[in-house]
A protein has these predicted regions:
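C-terminal catalytic histidine-bearing segment of alpha/beta-hydrolase fold enzymes
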Residues: 265, 272-338
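N-terminal cap/lid segment of alpha/beta-hydrolase-fold proteins
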Residues: 4, 13-64
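Short, surface-exposed "cap/lid" segments of acyl-processing enzymes
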Residues: 48-50, 54-106
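Conserved alpha/beta-hydrolase
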Residues: 94-125
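Primarily recognizes the serine-hydrolase "nucleophile elbow" in alpha/beta-hydrolase
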Residues: 149-220
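Structural cue for short, hydrophobic secondary-structure segments
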Residues: 71-74, 113, 264
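Alpha/beta-hydrolase active-site loop
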Residues: 134-158
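Mobile cap/lid helix-loop segments that gate and shape the active-site cleft of serine hydrolases
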Residues: 25-31, 203, 210-253
Length: 338
């Protein structure tokens, strides 16, 4: 982690809902699958409000037997070098894995990777942020509102409802669980509140190397000011905002009614985010009715890796892909039993 300058609070307005003219229309009769769609805008707010989609098969609206996978990248809310394409290696391994497992392969209706506005990073060595660039001057709740807008776009386009798995790495895991928290991130009467009202939370979340308790992250690394700088840069200086934005403060028992499975993945070799972040979240879910036993109606699962550093999990992608495939398979098998 590196030091960077604090920034003024974002003056960016609410998410602008993308017009119907910009929406992507998929006609199974005129498309060849698998199909890849890249840099699709889901809002007009900035150049980073886009997503990419891999469709292994023709989409079937409201298909009760398939799952959409949605990935949210990490990068400390600010790194322009870690965007949606960072999922490429994992996605490639995942497609290879599932090609040998027809039931899991058939269960995946699509894979989407989301970009969202970043917080300032004027000290970035090769791509410093410009204070006039709306894509590089975000402040909470801009990030989560972008993610909600992207999910809403996907739900309206492909009509999969809550049948999706939200996957996030590092601060992407923070954002994934913020979606499940089902909170109003802006003022109650702010137009962006419609996003929280209209987005259906996922049935499962996979959090990898996640930041789940921001005050604890800052306190545990008090000797390294870069951690505080990172949180202030993305969230502002008010500790109460950090607490409220932390998934560790979420009411998942009542707020995430459709949540059936949460998978917390962390490597003991992670040099940036300590294992205690996942341990905190594990305890939170346990206290809120998520069991450990296979077959539990609401389940929590912990996967500890031993040999991969923070970014190596997605750079290599093999073990990451295995976790995703196992999660999809577990959901499918659980539904078959019921």
């Amino acid at each position: 982690m590196t030091h960077y300058s604090d920034s003024k609070k974002s003056t960016q307005g609410p998410i602008s809902k993308i017009s119907s003219a910009m929406a992507t229309t998929i006609s199974p009769a005129t498309k060849t699958y698998p199909l890849d769609l890249t840099n699709i805008p889901y809002a007009t707010t900035s150049d980073l409000n886009n997503l990419s989609i891999h469709l292994p098969q023709a989409p079937v609206p409201e298909d009760p037997n398939r799952l959409f996978l949605i990935y949210i990248h990490g990068g400390a809310w600010r790194d322009p070098a870690i965007l949606a394409p960072s999922f490429a290696a994992t996605q490639s391994h995942l497609l290879n894995l599932t090609s040998n497992n027809p039931s899991t392969q058939d269960a995946i209706s699509g894979i989407a990777t989301i970009n969202y506005r970043l917080s300032p990073y004027p000290a970035h060595p090769t791509n410093p942020s410009n204070p006039h660039d709306p894509s590089r001057n975000a402040r909470h709740p801009d990030h989560i509102n972008d993610v909600l807008a992207a999910i809403l776009y996907l739900q309206e386009t492909y009509a999969f409802g809550n049948r999706y798995v939200l996957i996030g790495h590092s601060c992407g895991a923070t954002l994934a669980l913020q979606v499940a928290m089902k909170r109003f991130w802006g003022s109650q009467y702010d137009p962006t509140s419609a996003l929280e009202l209209n987005v259906e939370p996922p049935i499962a979340v996979i959090g990898v190397s996640g930041i789940y308790d921001m005050p604890r992250l800052v306190d545990d690394n008090a000797a390294q000011p870069a951690y505080r700088d990172l949180v202030v840069n993305a969230m502002g200086s008010e500790r109460k905002v950090w607490e409220d934005a932390s998934p560790s403060s979420g009411d998942f028992e009542d707020g995430w009614e459709d949540g059936r499975l949460v998978v917390l993945v962390h490597s003991e070799a992670d040099e940036l985010v300590g294992l205690e972040q996942s341990e905190i979240m594990w305890k939170v879910f346990g206290e809120q009715g998520f069991g450990e036993e296979a077959g539990s109606q609401r389940r929590r699962k912990c996967i500890k890796l031993t040999d991969l550093k923070h970014d190596e999990i997605w750079e290599d992608g093999k073990k990451f892909a295995e976790v995703i495939a196992q999660t999809v398979d577990e959901i499918v098998r659980g539904e078959e039993k019921n």
